């Protein structure tokens, strides 16, 4: 009898070994994940204290703007599987909404009136910056649904072409609705002169925090404002991903026909993807317009849409940390690193410029290299090599990593571990 009990216990232990090892692996991965998140959060918080130049903080704030944009596009492409090549249009709509309601452009003659959130006077309508954030997000979301409606029956390349058209139409319309426009309408957008005089966020004073966005010597308040907006966006997007809507997005991304047979409302699900993705673009537009104090419509070109797309693909579609990583890399590459690399190449080329014929010619070429002017080419090459060498991205979600990785024993082991953990 004792031998039977011992044998049964041994068989039970062998059966439970995969379970216990899987749970131990999950526990280790979660501990590593939270440690990494804590280290990144600490590094982000202390970053401005180690930057002596204001342009470095400005570069970080611009990178934060693109992080917001990439997070929004990730909803459309990474979660719902809808290719949107006109995403910069919603960026423009958010910035334009901020410019309309936060600059002297809409001057009125009504008597002066003030409230904690809105002030009316001869200089225009000025809505409090913090109230403008949800207003611009709602405006961009409405336009996202409006532009998404005609694409409901389109798939793949056809969807991409139509969204590309919308992305080109919006900035062109804004440029042509300025003073003296062909329609005879009043100046709505400022035209080629754009809109300027946009108000910055009001100074914050609470507890030991003093954030002056205008008169302060430091650009750090802008950086921390962007950090707060990113943190809020991540929380909202993670909640959406784990919700019923997020599962519906995953279903239509994998097989729209099967999703429809399971009772998922395809029209509603797709429109919500376009609308919510556009909302985060409008979110970023408010930050950009307030930081620069003006809106130039040439900023919202097709190149911007492609840049954001490259960020999402490089980092890993469907992966929040991957998208953030891709946005930071591409932003700094565009803002700082290409210029620094060009300067080093120019310096080396200057040393060989007066050499023998071939060396001198090559040195002259190096001395005049400007990588910043070849940004579209470089970004295209990055996109090409990413798709060829690492299609899942630098930091993919576990789901996409399994889809695109070869079926090796290592991958199968990760799949077994995934049974006991959440999606990243």
Q: What kind of feature is each model-predicted range?
A:
Residues 2-424:
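Transmembrane alpha-helices and adjacent helix-loop boundaries
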